[in-house]
Swiss-Prot record:
Alphabetized UniProt keyword annotations: Amino-acid biosynthesis, Hydrolase, Methionine biosynthesis
Organism name: Bacillus cytotoxicus (strain DSM 22905 / CIP 110041 / 391-98 / NVH 391-98)
Substrates-to-products reaction catalysed: S-adenosyl-L-homocysteine + H2O = S-(5-deoxy-D-ribos-5-yl)-L-homocysteine + adenine; S-methyl-5'-thioadenosine + H2O = 5-(methylsulfanyl)-D-ribose + adenine; 5'-deoxyadenosine + H2O = 5-deoxy-D-ribose + adenine
GO MF term list: adenosylhomocysteine nucleosidase activity; methylthioadenosine nucleosidase activity
Protein name: 5'-methylthioadenosine/S-adenosylhomocysteine nucleosidase
Length: 231
């Protein structure tokens, strides 16, 4: 099976790239694609760059050029739920934009005109990820909504504003909704699996740097477990 894994930054893809066998690297429009084999699957690892435009552009190239059967977006995120801690993992059930507002024209907050209000992750991939999480003992793994915007959430006032827009929001980051929207348009199953590098609004600029490597390791290990179970 051909599986695409997307991470925004070098820190988020480096560990997984080192695990790929027969790796071949290709650069297209500033995006790094690494093809290789891992646990019996052909894996296309994309380093997309940070933010929604980079994520949308590179995911489009990915789907057109490599035609993966499934897409997994990995990396770090800011935790938005009071019960979560740094290093915990969030599996997406739904992904939304948190910086889109066309409510003046009767769209839901976060809804892009012509698109659904949110993008549903593939139920089979979510269930598989949830099954894999049962083996985790020292890391809390939850499933829920992830929201995306082109901002790093270090301002408590902005955090409070976003919390007021979405119920049961578990994490925020800067690429997932763009990846999900492109996958929706191409009808390619996707899931977002993010490890928390910080808790939004609580000294985010400090804890992000401190815990990014830990979050990347947790996320990568979890991705490998999911790949092992994919049939």
């Amino acid at each position: 099976m051909r599986i695409a894994v997307i991470g925004a930054m070098e820190e988020e893809v480096r560990i997984l790239r080192d695990k790929l066998e027969q790796a071949e690297i290709e650069s297209v429009a500033g995006c790094e694609f690494t093809k290789g084999m891992l646990v019996g699957h052909e894996v296309i690892l994309l380093k997309s760059g940070i933010g929604k435009v980079n994520a949308a552009m590179s995911t489009t190239i990915l789907l057109e050029r490599y035609q993966p059967e499934k897409v997994i977006n990995t990396g770090s995120a800011g935790g938005f739920h009071h019960a979560l801690n740094v290093g915990d993992v969030v599996i997406s059930t739904e992904v939304r934009h948190h910086d889109v507002d066309v409510t003046a024209f009767n769209y839901e907050y976060g809804q892009v005109p012509g698109m659904p209000p949110g993008f549903k992750a593939d139920k089979e991939l979510v269930a598989l990820a949830e099954q894999c999480m049962k083996e985790e003992e020292n890391i809390q793994v939850v499933k829920g909504m992830i929201a995306t915007g082109d901002s790093f959430m270090s301002d408590p006032n902005r955090v409070a504003a976003i919390r007021g827009k979405f119920e049961n929001l578990y994490a925020v980051e800067m690429e997932a909704a763009a990846v999900a929207q492109v996958c929706h348009q191409y009808n390619v199953p996707f899931v977002i699996i993010r490890a928390l590098s910080d808790i939004a609004g609580k000294e985010s600029n400090v804890s992000f740097d401190q815990f990014l490597d830990q979050a990347a390791l947790h996320s990568t290990n979890f991705i490998v477990k999911v790949l092992k179970e994919l049939k």
